[in-house]
Amino acid sequence: MANVVVIGAQWGDEGKGKITDLLSRSADVVVRYQGGVNAGHTIVVDDKVLKLHLIPSGILYEDTTCLIGSGTVVDPKILLKEIDMLIENGIDISGLKISSTSHVTMPYHRLLDEAMEADRGSNKIGTTGRGIGPTYADKSQRNGIRIRDLLNEDRLKDVLEIPLKEKNGVLEKIYGIRPLCKDEIIKEYLDYGKRLSKHVVDCTRTIHSAAKNKQNILFEGAQGTLLDLDHGTYPFVTSSNPISGGACIGAGVGPTLIDRVIGVAKAYTTRVGEGPFVTELQGSINDQLCDRGSEFGTTTGRRRRCGWFDGVIGKYAVYVNGLDCLAVTKLDVLDELDEIQVCIAYELDGKEIDYFPTNSDDLKKCKPIFKKLKGWQCSTANCRKLSDLPENAMNYLRFLAELMEVPIAIVSLGANRDQTIVIEDPIHGPKRALLR
């Protein structure tokens, strides 16, 4: 039995959904511990493409409990769309549970998010415009609406009074946006509450009960390490903590409950939105990675920025999260390249550094120092064990493991479930050297 955290080791979009889906087969409980509908993961099942933003990937397994934890912010309108989509595809959603203390994204949060981002002009952050930041801001200011508030009309009227008055004032006086109607919001969100009520639980008690019964618990993060509010490329970050420590806070468990932390990293690097990106590529190779990797955001549809694998941020992710092993995804995207580069250090103000600068101004000045490796120029999409991989592909993986000083447990070679090499089951397997 093992309790495992799956986190993104880059700027999000690493393929965590597929890895979580894979590991969910061995999990009894899957917990989403932070983020909101600004995240998105795509799962391919029997040629069906399922795109989820809030519901954990484990929902595809009927005996698995899927819990949206207290650290997650929930847009009930989008959540219900996901529920309806799953039901239409014949997927049982009885295992879905929602923490009663999760905060709710309200209509004014979305309006404020869009208005504030537009107002920033050239200094925009690159927000998805889904209201995540304003929702977390209200949570921090103790002015938020929680899932439990949608279950009682009198309570919803009471807790909505002050924030709606404040937000309407800001929307109207600063941004020239028409005020929202309280009665309409109450009616709409009480309806959401009725539909979701059968899924609402006490998050901490649910996880504690599972742990007491020796069940396997999988903690699923959204976004990635470099988007962490405290440890990412601030201010170009999200409004929560995707790193492994965030799992304890967002799920309501102690750190001693965590047995293993798995980092998910692409075989190259991508980033959506604004912010420094040291290994970013331009021109034909960037286009090739983007096209072969289908690098368009699940949530926004925005084209992702692409670059070579950055070992500096990789080592930073290992340290910040305490990674035990790695899952490397999209290795197949590199199949056609005759030469592949990996960033092994930065140059900052004429000096070589091997650490990640936490100051975004310094990071913008950094230049990558690359190690060139030979490509393999043949398809890896049908490889199912390590011995099937071309020698240069194996050399590439070994180099990444050596550079990051952490073993590789899983290699993904495409979107489908079976396009995966599992070197060791991170939940049931012993903690030992995998691929170094």
Curated annotation (Swiss-Prot):
PROSITE patterns: ADENYLOSUCCIN_SYN_1, ADENYLOSUCCIN_SYN_2
Keyword Cytoplasm in annotation: yes
InterPro entries (UniProt xref): Adenylosuccin_syn_GTP-bd (IPR018220), Adenylosuccin_syn_Lys_AS (IPR033128), Adenylosuccinate_synth_dom1 (IPR042109), Adenylosuccinate_synth_dom2 (IPR042110), Adenylosuccinate_synth_dom3 (IPR042111), Adenylosuccinate_synthetase (IPR001114), P-loop_NTPase (IPR027417)
Family affiliation: Belongs to the adenylosuccinate synthetase family.
Physiological role: Plays an important role in the de novo pathway of purine nucleotide biosynthesis. Catalyzes the first committed step in the biosynthesis of AMP from IMP.
Protein name per Swiss-Prot or TrEMBL: Adenylosuccinate synthetase
Gene name as annotated: purA
Species: Prochlorococcus marinus (strain MIT 9515)
Binding site for Mg(2+): D13, G40
GO molecular function, one term: magnesium ion binding
E.C. no: 6.3.4.4
Cofactor(s) the record lists: Mg(2+)
Gene Ontology cellular-component annotations: cytoplasm
GO BP term, example: 'de novo' AMP biosynthetic process
